[in-house]
UniProtKB/Swiss-Prot annotation:
UniProt cross-references to SUPFAM superfamilies, sorted A to Z: Globin-like
UniProt xrefs under Pfam families: Globin
Entry keywords, A to Z: Acetylation, Heme, Iron, Metal-binding, Oxygen transport, Phosphoprotein, S-nitrosylation, Transport
Name of this chain's protein: Hemoglobin subunit beta
Occurrences of domain Globin (ranges): 1-145
Documented effect of changing residue 134 to A: In allele beta-I
PANTHER family: HEMOGLOBIN FAMILY MEMBER, HEMOGLOBIN SUBUNIT BETA
Source organism: Bos mutus grunniens (Wild yak)
Residues modified as S-nitrosocysteine: 92
UniProt superkingdom: Eukaryota
Residues the record lists as Phosphothreonine modifications: 11
Family assignment from sequence similarity: Belongs to the globin family.
Lineage: Eukaryota, Metazoa, Chordata, Craniata, Vertebrata
Gene3D superfamilies listed in its UniProt record: Globins
Amino acid sequence: MLTAEEKAAVTAFWGKVKVDEVGGEALGRLLVVYPWTQRFFESFGDLSSADAVMNNPKVKAHGKKVLDSFSNGMKHLDDLKGTFAALSELHCDKLHVDPENFKLLGNVLVVVLARHFGKEFTPVLQADFQKVVVGVANALAHRYH
């Protein structure tokens, strides 16, 4: 999946990410850009507009929770399937989340990182990071196969 050099680059970069800010924005953007994903978050209250979604405290809190789990995965890049096994089971068996949504969230996360870090998020770093989000999405979808 990743070379030692790529792992070092994404791990060093991830240390700069403010998971509370980036997580809330990434989940919020997912819900705005792909509105059908909102059905999994009906208990979050007002999701009636982009502004409502992006300022919703439950969206922000859950986005942080999602990125906290992602951060754990960043510590276990060689065992993403094992790291995300319980979450894969939860999302498959209990929540019935379409596994395509994991890919969508990963892509939205890359957009948010580019927005937050600008030129520091180079094309090479983006390519390395894209491998990570694909790996995480595949690990989360593992239970579905």
